Regions:
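Catalytic core of pol beta-like nucleotidyltransferases
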Residues: 1-25, 31-38, 50-103
């Protein structure tokens, strides 16, 4: 996992609580670390929202994405868990994902 994520862990936790996130996991090059290019790579995050509260609107989802991007200083792809249909992509996410937050 890239150091930027650990450096901003407290702020990430605060955003997760604010937006009723149950789990937030990093995957892709930011999880692997070795092939992450600080000049070009984005950060791929898998989000699971709390099922006990109303699901956030798309506007709220994109607000969370934008706040995470501003915090981390780079583009963030915020993928909703369960929305990935391609079995090969799902398998790759499962292989590399690392937890950032769990409620």
């Amino acid at each position: 996992m890239i150091p930027t994520l650990d450096a901003h862990r407290a702020e990430i936790v605060a955003l997760c609580r604010r937006f009723h996130v149950r789990r937030l996991e990093v995957f892709g090059s930011a999880a692997r670390g070795g092939d992450f290019d600080p000049a070009r790579s984005d950060i791929d995050l898998l989000v699971t929202y709390d099922a006990e509260v109303p699901r956030p609107s798309l506007a709220e989802h994109f607000t969370l994405r934008d706040l995470l991007a501003a915090l981390l200083g780079r583009k963030v792809d915020l993928v909703i868990a369960g929305a990935v249909r391609n079995p090969f992509v799902r398998a790759d996410i499962e292989r590399w994902k690392e937890p950032l937050y769990a409620a």
